[in-house]
């Protein structure tokens, strides 16, 4: 099974990359930064793709999969990136929507969703059993979250201002 992280250099996407590699999946990371793509390779990404240089990246992603399409896409971009994810997904594949960085509303491309029988699933915190299973996997594999920086709690406003800039690689954490 192959996974893809869309705009994949934030904390959630990098954690998903680590989980994909833990279970033996081939994984691709899409980013707009050469430096971040190299760091994703260092974390185990099998392939990286620059969405700034390849705005129609769905086609290149299909090539990565041998032309069949990706089994599972972790979609954090939202309406601006979902159309390319729909081009990249294999028939019957799953797109897990875990973020909407480009906004909460879009014109849906129902034709691709229906004809490719795509499973589009929203992801939130989840349930306790899933959380416990995730924790067991983390413990067994030694996965560590990628932390870009840790700020004291009194720098909360600064941390919130850093997030939309997208310059971080991994999580921005607050220390209490």
Model-derived regions, located:
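Mid-domain Rossmann-like dinucleotide-binding core that forms the NAD(H)/NADP(H) cofactor-binding site
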Residues: 1-54
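Short amphipathic alpha-helix with an adjacent loop that forms part of the alpha/beta core around
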Residues: 55-67
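N-terminal Rossmann-like NAD(P) cofactor-binding module of classical short-chain dehydrogenase/reductase
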Residues: 49, 71-74
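C-terminal capping/lid region of NAD(P)-dependent oxidoreductase domains
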Residues: 67, 142-146, 157-176
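Short acidic/histidine-rich motifs immediately flanking catalytic phosphotransfer sites
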Residues: 68-69, 90
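Local beta-strand N-terminus motif with an aromatic residue
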Residues: 45, 69-70, 156
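Glycine-rich phosphate-binding loop and adjacent beta-alpha segment
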Residues: 23, 31-34, 76-149, 153, ...
């Amino acid at each position: 099974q192959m996974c893809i992280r869309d705009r994949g250099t934030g904390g959630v996407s990098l954690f998903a990359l680590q989980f994909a590699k833990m279970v033996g999946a081939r994984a691709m990371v899409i980013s707009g930064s050469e430096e971040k793509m190299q760091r994703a390779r260092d974390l185990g990404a099998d392939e990286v793709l620059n969405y700034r240089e390849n705005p129609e990246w769905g086609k290149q992603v299909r090539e990565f999969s041998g032309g069949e399409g990706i089994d599972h896409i972790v979609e954090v971009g939202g309406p601006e990136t979902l159309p390319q994810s729909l081009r990249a997904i294999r028939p019957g594949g799953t797109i897990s929507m875990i973020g909407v960085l480009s906004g909460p509303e879009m014109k849906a491309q129902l034709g691709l969703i229906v004809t490719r029988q795509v499973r589009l699933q929203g992801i939130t915190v989840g349930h306790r059993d899933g959380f416990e299973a995730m924790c067991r996997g983390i413990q067994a594999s030694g996965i560590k979250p990628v932390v870009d920086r840790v700020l004291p709690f009194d720098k909360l406003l600064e941390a919130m201002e850093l997030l939309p800039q997208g310059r971080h690689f991994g999580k921005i954490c607050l220390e209490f």
